[in-house]
Amino acid sequence: MSNSFEQISLKHGFMKHNGGVMFRNISENEYEFKSVINENHLNAAGITHGGYLAALIDAGAGTAAHRSAQNAPCVTISLDLKYIGASKIGDEIIGNVKILKKTKTLVFLFCELKCNDKIITSASGVWKILKIKS
């Protein structure tokens, strides 16, 4: 497995526009991703917007689902979020993903976002593995 992070936001799109996401495999069932909070990620209270944290989890956990499915395309079926803490501009957010179960068509996972070693968001989700015909 890779010890170094790679940029996964290479194509034009939402996550690249929002600062990008770095990603790495920890083991067959564990993955890690990270991003740094900038002023575009803040809400009116000056903390990271919950919508950005949701998008960050969707991107990072979705990439973990994709990698665990041998790089098959995967789409989010459900994503249940719990906002526990806060982060602010300049903070590095680290996401940890654990694949709980994988079938031929679904990936079930759990994810936590941490800032300064404190959990700020937790999520459980299900991704559909797509069978794309050539």
What is each model feature region?
Residues 1-134:
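Terminal targeting signals and extreme-terminal segments of soluble enzymes
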